[in-house]
């Protein structure tokens, strides 16, 4: 069954019980709008539940019960009514009537109302129900007077009366204790917006999360001005449009300065009070979960309107502050920062962030000084705002650093000069310098120089120097990112220096190994040469003379035979060993080494005929024996076979190893005396 069919069933049941007032009772139930589930519950509920609902509606509408209904069916008291007043239908457990939760009436009637005024007041206090007419007790006293209920306008409070006008056809039958009576400002007394003292300032009213009806603005809340009109501004007119026009009870025009200031303050106070009440209203159902308002939602629209108003006022306040700051910047110049809440960042601040050294100074002072960092800050605050003072905690402190907010303060202090006296201590001020500036001479002393003393002749000063690069890059920077960059550069520099040292060491070891190989080869060749027998070697390529010979001394156990060099018969010469005894002084020490072989090489393998003739006509004889004489010998053929195997002076078991093997194309003589290759 849907809500429409349930409504028809409920109306038919009410019409069967009370046909005279069925339309009014049904209209009240529809206006209250308890939900579809509650309507279905009334349609299928017992007769006692329907009688209790009808009796409660008659009390609210001030209707007399029909005589047959009073005699036939007893009504259930309102205090024991199981009817659940819930807008969200979140629970099905019955709740007692809100009459037991009713508060005292906020209105105190005067004695001019007649003798029945006290009795009517007592009846009204005893029959306080959830009605759009009586407002649910003290809710009207706590409602904000100038803010709409549930997001509606202020004049929308009377729309409910217009909707319920058809319910009050008979004016004579209305109970004066339940009817809404009009009171002027002199006949009523109502508490102010902030005079509510309960945890639930809205009471226990269920309609729209607040009071069912709100009274008109009272005199003490309207704040009448001297001309008799209220100076409260119209919020709708301030936003651009007011539907009431000239008949609006609030001011649409401009206000005086004092009135506008008071109005703004009052609006802010009302907004804050309303937000506090809405917060307590949200906390109230949590504290009393079984109250009729335990499941009622709060009014988000009114809260959002108050928040929007507060945000708008805050934005206007910020705009005013910006305008004042701009005026101070234009008029005051450098002194504007003294009147502002906090200094704003400009180009100078960004430059000082990139170059923190421009905002710092370096202090030097005697070691026996007794001043503290606070004393230094108080002294230099005369020149400008001080950001930080750093003095190292040492036994003999002699230096410190002061950081200012503006770099102009540093320029002013440096321009003043030295000395400064802080607590009778002489303090010298110097400009701050970055650590990255390393002089070249210290860097050269720290770096090794192996260009001349190295055995390999290598220059160790390779281009792996990152100090100068890092000094240039980090000269005007001290931020976190640049500190990380500095660390990376240092790590790269250390890695490069380590690699450089490894390369130099490996190259130096390679050079030493090459030198060891050369020296060992030379020593081995010399040792093998001294073990062999002596052989006369004709050094015709270097000396150029036919008779020049190189003689190597032989041991005394030689055989005494001679070896003669052959030449032409016309140019043969006898060399006397006795006359040439002093020729032994011309013996070279490195005759058998590889250097001598290199020097004996001709300039060209194709030698001229004159040099070849001079070489083959030169004769030399060596006689080794007891007499020690050199004799002449016949010519012999010098060839590879004669030197290698036909030499009678060489022992057959010894070979002379040569450190180098070279091929020499030697010329030979023909039978006719011509030289052939």
Swiss-Prot record:
InterPro entries: AtC3H46-like_PABC-like (IPR056276), AtC3H46-like_RRM (IPR034365), Nucleotide-bd_a/b_plait_sf (IPR012677), RBD_domain_sf (IPR035979), RRM_dom (IPR000504), Znf_CCCH (IPR000571)
GO molecular function annotation: DNA binding; RNA binding; zinc ion binding
Keyword presence, Signal: no
Residue spans of biased composition, Low complexity class: 69-82
Protein origin, superkingdom: Eukaryota
Ranges where the record places region Disordered: 66-117, 535-607
Compositional bias per record (Basic and acidic residues), positions renumbered to this chain: 589-601
Keyword terms, alphabetized: Coiled coil, DNA-binding, Metal-binding, RNA-binding, Zinc, Zinc-finger
Residue ranges, compositional bias (Polar residues): 98-113, 535-562
Residue ranges occupied by any RRM domain in the UniProt entry: 359-435
Record PROSITE patterns: RRM (PS50102), ZF_C3H1 (PS50103)
Zn finger limits (C3H1-type): 228-255
Coiled-coil ranges per UniProt: 480-513
UniProt entry tagged with the keyword Zinc-finger: yes
PANTHER family attached to this UniProt entry: RNA-BINDING (RRM/RBD/RNP MOTIFS), ZINC FINGER CCCH DOMAIN-CONTAINING PROTEIN 22
Protein's name according to its UniProt entry: Zinc finger CCCH domain-containing protein 23
Species name: Oryza sativa subsp. japonica
Taxonomic lineage: Eukaryota, Viridiplantae, Streptophyta, Embryophyta, Tracheophyta
